[in-house]
Amino acid sequence: MKGKFIVIEGLEGAGKSSAHQSVVRVLHELGIKDVVFTREPGGTPLAEKLRHLIKHETEEPVTDKAELLMLYAARIQLVENVIKPALMQGKWVVGDRHDMSSQAYQGGGRQLDPHFMLTLKETVLGDFEPDLTIYLDIDPIVGLARARGRGELDRIEQMDLDFFRRTRARYLALVKDNPKAVMINAEQSIELVQADIERAVKNWWKSNEK
């Protein structure tokens, strides 16, 4: 039986790492033990090199379109070399970010042309998409404060507050229009967030159970 692809999305400081643990815990309860974890950008040797270029300052400025193209290069390497093979083997994949991140950060935050974004997505990914996306919603002020508490911020995390407000607004619009996405209030206590995530996964499981 083919596996399923679950993605966790959200701004910096939303708690994606904890959410991943919650999802895996629920899957184990449901009898799904063979779970693969991925992150974007990254997840393959080439994709990890691209991740470093995307997240760190380089000798020359990285243009917005160059950033987006590197993200898609890393994404398709991960999809074709890791995610699709795992799904075909019946494994489940839990991803830290996927295409919705690019639509929100580069489409919303960077304000890149929507037509260009859509064309690139369709050209690179075709109809491939997650079976379930869990979006952790958080006010950028709260999220960035949490991120700063973890230590030094990367190149994208250093963007101004308006960038993250635009990114969040795009996330909210994307989730509203996506029947395969659920939104979780990530400003709650970690216990309530975990409970909401577990409930969302179980409800999705029941509605898709054959």
From Swiss-Prot:
Keywords: ATP-binding, Kinase, Nucleotide biosynthesis, Nucleotide-binding, Transferase. Pfam families: Thymidylate_kin (PF02223). It is an enzyme of class 2 (transferase). GO terms for molecular function: ATP binding; dTMP kinase activity. ATP binds at residues 10-17. InterPro entries: P-loop_NTPase, Thymidylate_kin-like_dom, Thymidylate_kin_CS, Thymidylate_kinase. One of its GO terms (cellular component) is cytosol. It comes from the Bacteria. It catalyses: dTMP + ATP = dTDP + ADP. Its EC number is 2.7.4.9. The keyword ATP-binding applies. One of its GO terms (biological process) is dUDP biosynthetic process. SUPFAM superfamilies: P-loop containing nucleoside triphosphate hydrolases. Phosphorylation of dTMP to form dTDP in both de novo and salvage pathways of dTTP synthesis. Belongs to the thymidylate kinase family. This is Thymidylate kinase.
